[in-house]
Amino acid sequence: MAADGERSPLLSEPIDGGAGGNGLVGPGGSGAGPGGGLTPSAPPYGAGKHAPPQAFPPFPEGHPAVLPGEDPPPYSPLTSPDSGSAPMITCRVCQSLINVEGKMHQHVVKCGVCNEATPIKNAPPGKKYVRCPCNCLLICKVTSQRIACPRPYCKRIINLGPVHPGPLSPEPQPMGVRVICGHCKNTFLWTEFTDRTLARCPHCRKVSSIGRRYPRKRCICCFLLGLLLAVTATGLAFGTWKHARRYGGIYAAWAFVILLAVLCLGRALYWACMKVSHPVQNFS
């Protein structure tokens, strides 16, 4: 009995007081009940805890996702939930990207970085956008000449200059043919649609012909005229040989006809040696 008393705890566990027990724990770890019997004072160790589920086997020990000393996988913006095929525009002030998803019905959007407005649509009819040097986006009438910035720390007056009301006629597009210069091989625009197909290159300042038809025709005409004048000068010389000794003016007539023949033949040679520029494509 002494040995049993030494193994009992020093402090007894309380039991239900409604049963009339003395609240002491006897040997064996039990308390006396109303009938003199012994009742357990406390549940055994671990009885109040839930048993772990037995349906799931323990996880096998494998290699970790990231080994020690190894860098984690790089972040990809395509896997971010915020990224995707959302429409984006560039801020006109800080060049940051602005998501305009769900805002396409608006005319301007606000940048989340610099808090400035950026237009995503054209201004309403009769209006135009003007950006103040303080980066404030203003909208005013097309005919406005002076506007004031509404920001209290700016209040700047912006002069837009004289504006002539009325629809602006678009500038006519140049019509012509792009050709490759026969001298410097550079491309330039030829806009003179006439029978005289001579063009001066703006790069080398030399004259060439657009196509071979015009210089060939001029060469043939000058050659035939020069040949006719040469025959005329020869016949005139043989026919007036005797009279030339008496009248000195006949020599002047010979010289004039021969000079015309030489000029025509020289001009024919000029047209025959002229460089030709070839057209590339229609500009219009």
Swiss-Prot record:
Topological relation to the membrane, as annotated: Multi-pass membrane protein
Signal peptide positions on this chain: none
Stated name of the protein: Type 1 phosphatidylinositol 4,5-bisphosphate 4-phosphatase
Molecular function in Gene Ontology: phosphatidylinositol-4,5-bisphosphate 4-phosphatase activity
Record EC number: 3.1.3.78
Physiological role: Catalyzes the hydrolysis of phosphatidylinositol-4,5-bisphosphate (PtdIns-4,5-P2) to phosphatidylinositol-4-phosphate (PtdIns-4-P). Does not hydrolyze phosphatidylinositol 3,4,5-trisphosphate, phosphatidylinositol 3,4-bisphosphate, inositol 3,5-bisphosphate, inositol 3,4-bisphosphate, phosphatidylinositol 5-monophosphate, phosphatidylinositol 4-monophosphate and phosphatidylinositol 3-monophosphate. Regulates lysosomal positioning by recruiting JIP4 to lysosomal membranes, thus inducing retrograde transport of lysosomes along microtubules.
Gene Ontology cellular component terms for the protein in this record: late endosome membrane; lysosomal membrane; phagocytic vesicle membrane; plasma membrane
Pfam families the UniProt entry points to: Tmemb_55A (PF09788)
Residues with Phosphoserine modification: 169
EC class name: hydrolase
Main location group: membrane
Biased composition regions of type Gly residues, renumbered to the chain: 17-38
UniProt entry tagged with the keyword Oxidoreductase: no
Span of the annotated motif CX5R motif: 140-146
Species, as recorded: Macaca fascicularis
